[in-house]
């Protein structure tokens, strides 16, 4: 005789959606799905559970129900992985009646739908970034998880620089629940700029963007995963996307006349920019190129003339000297389109302060991590409406060398030779080198050259902006990211 589903509410942390006795490995076992999404069973007198975040999907196979899960560190209802590892496992049970099986299927489906997980994603894979392993990472680690979670994928390999930006500018955003970048940070930057160059940018920029580390930088995904104790891995990143949770992200608009660039990571001028860009000549060294060329740049230290102006966040008004700031405005006859023009703020009416050179380094950050091993701005927040500014002026070479070795844990900002503050708006007026006045520097934003000064590295190559005054303003929470919490 078929057994009807019944509720068993003893010691449950939340009400049961469904509770019944089922067969697990041939043994009749109580099984409960709670309103919090916890799947609980008892085998051999020992209670086990799988949290909702571990369940990828389910499938009915004849008389049985297969629950596909991803668990970590030995937890979960069926995990046999070692500590610190993720393990993909199937938990299989057999309801004792057709009615019970249908009810389990309906309740599982309703619960997964209620979580708001993505159903279809546009995935960019950059096969040229970093160690050129993005294609392999996607096929072996990322795609199988998305398939187990029943997420439809439209896959696009990028073929050249700005390819992703071109696609995003013209695609039908209503077809997707999000965009995924299997790459370093570069494709993310292209996607954000593409979304903001659309006439429907107000809707488009709210499309969640997910990152899977497969490049040389990976600062954004490191900033997302590190605070919750997750490793910066493709698996951790993918499961965060599958769960569908999101968070807002500030976007900085860098302007020079009518030219604009939308930044989500950082801007650098001076030492950090020189190391980042000029070390490309040693790319064959891998990540060691930054350390080796960084040492060379410290030994042969450059300082730059210039001036920076900024609007400090509350609590940072003591930095710099009070100053007036002339904000560049677009010519009245400029071609105004419906695309995003930057935050609507009256910058000239704000309380501006200034610092004058010489400068060793000027570094602005939107998120804590600049790369997987560089905690550039430990106090940076994703959507506080401010950029974190790190300024180094006069600094002995030995002290600078010590300071640079502390980038991995963020303690470099505690150095007496570093000023660390938060700003709402920023103006950079870059100048020439102190020791070689006929040479200028490089302005680097989000890993790409924004401007090349006179006689700088590869100065003959075209850049988006000129080596001159530029201004930056922040639009709080403009973009949206898939996030682990």
Curated annotation (Swiss-Prot):
The record's note on what follows loss of this gene reads:
No visible phenotype under normal growth conditions, but seeds have increased germination speed after imbibition, without affecting overall germination rate.
Q: Which residues form the DAGKc domain?
A: 116-258
What PANTHER family does its record include?
A: ACYLGLYCEROL KINASE, MITOCHONDRIAL (PTHR12358:SF31), SPHINGOSINE KINASE (PTHR12358)
Q: In which tissues is it expressed?
A: Highly expressed in stems and flowers and at lower levels in roots, leaves and siliques.
Tell me the superkingdom of the source. Eukaryota
Presence of the UniProt keyword Transport in the record: no
| Record localization | Vacuole membrane
Binding of substrate occurs at 183-186, 276
Q: Which organism is it from?
A: Arabidopsis thaliana
Q: Does the keyword Transmembrane apply?
A: no
Write out the function statement from the record: Involved in the production of sphingolipid metabolites. Phosphorylates sphingosine and various sphingoid long-chain base (LCB) products, such as phytosphingosine (PHS, 4-hydroxysphinganine), 4-hydroxy-8-sphingenine, 4,8-sphingadienine, D-erythro-dihydrosphingosine and D,L-threo-dihydrosphingosine. Is required for abscisic acid (ABA) signaling that mediates stomatal closure, inhibition of seed germination and root elongation. May function upstream of PLDALPHA1 and phosphatidic acid (PA) in an amplification response to ABA that mediates stomatal closure.
How this chain sits in the membrane, per its record, is: Peripheral membrane protein
Query: What would you give as a GO molecular function for this chain, any one?
Result: ATP binding
Q: What is this protein called?
A: Sphingosine kinase 1
Any Pfam family matching the protein: YegS_C
Cofactor section: Mg(2+)
A GO term from the CC aspect = plant-type vacuole membrane
Instruction: Provide the organism lineage as a comma list.
Output: Eukaryota, Viridiplantae, Streptophyta, Embryophyta, Tracheophyta
Query: Disulfide pairs?
Result: none
Q: Which UniProt keywords apply?
A: ATP-binding, Kinase, Membrane, Nucleotide-binding, Stress response, Transferase, Vacuole
Please name the PROSITE patterns in this protein's record: DAGK
- Which GO biological-process labels does this protein carry? cellular response to abscisic acid stimulus; response to abscisic acid; seed germination; sphingolipid metabolic process
């Amino acid at each position: 005789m078929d057994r009807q589903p019944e509720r068993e509410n003893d010691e449950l942390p939340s009400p049961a959606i469904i509770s019944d006795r089922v067969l697990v490995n041939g043994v009749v076992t109580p099984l409960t799905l709670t309103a919090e999404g916890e799947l609980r069973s008892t085998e051999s007198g020992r209670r086990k559970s799988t949290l909702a975040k571990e369940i990828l999907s389910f499938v009915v196979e004849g008389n049985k129900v297969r629950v596909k899960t991803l668990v970590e560190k030995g937890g979960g209802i069926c995990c046999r992985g070692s500590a610190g590892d993720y393990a993909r496992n199937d938990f299989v049970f057999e309801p004792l009646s057709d009615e019970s099986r249908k009810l389990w299927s309906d309740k599982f489906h309703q619960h997964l739908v209620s979580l708001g997980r993505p159903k279809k994603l546009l995935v960019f894979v950059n096969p040229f970034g970093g160690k050129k392993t993005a294609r392999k990472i996607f096929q072996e680690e990322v795609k199988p998880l998305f398939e187990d979670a029943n997420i439809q994928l439209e896959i696009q390999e990028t073929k050249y620089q700005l390819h992703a930006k071109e696609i995003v500018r013209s695609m039908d955003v209503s077809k997707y629940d999000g965009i995924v970048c299997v790459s370093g940070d570069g494709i993310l930057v292209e996607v954000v700029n593409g979304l903001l160059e659309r006439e429907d940018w107000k809707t488009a920029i709210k499309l969640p963007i997910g990152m899977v580390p497969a490049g040389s930088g990976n600062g954004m995904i490191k900033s997302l995963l590190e605070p919750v104790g997750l490793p910066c891995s493709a698996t951790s990143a993918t499961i965060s996307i599958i769960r569908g949770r999101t968070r807002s992200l500030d976007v900085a608009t860098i302007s020079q006349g009518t030219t604009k660039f939308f930044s989500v990571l950082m801007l650098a001028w001076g030492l950090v920019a020189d190391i980042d860009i000029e070390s490309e000549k040693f790319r064959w060294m891998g990540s060691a190129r930054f350390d080796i060329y960084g040492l060379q740049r410290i030994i042969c230290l450059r300082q730059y003339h210039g001036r920076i102006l900024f609007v400090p966040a509350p609590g940072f008004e003591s930095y710099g000297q009070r100053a007036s700031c002339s904000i560049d405005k677009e010519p009245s006859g400029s071609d105004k389109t419906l695309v995003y023009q930057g935050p609507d703020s009256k910058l000239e009416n704000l309380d501006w302060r200034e610092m004058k050179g010489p400068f060793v380094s000027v570094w602005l950050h939107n998120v804590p991590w600049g790369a997987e091993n560089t905690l550039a701005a430990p106090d940076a927040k994703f959507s506080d409406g401010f950029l974190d500014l790190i300024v180094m002026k006069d600094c002995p070479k030995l002290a600078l060398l010590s300071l640079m070795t502390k980038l991995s844990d963020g303690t470099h900002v505690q150095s007496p030779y570093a000023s660390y503050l938060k700003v709402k708006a920023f103006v950079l007026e870059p100048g020439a080198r102190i020791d070689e006045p006929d040479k200028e520097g490089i302005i680097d934003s989000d890993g790409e050259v924004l401007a090349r000064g006179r006689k700088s590295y590869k100065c003959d190559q075209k850049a988006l902006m000129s080596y001159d005054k530029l201004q930056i303003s922040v639009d709080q929470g403009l973009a949206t990211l898939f996030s682990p919490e």
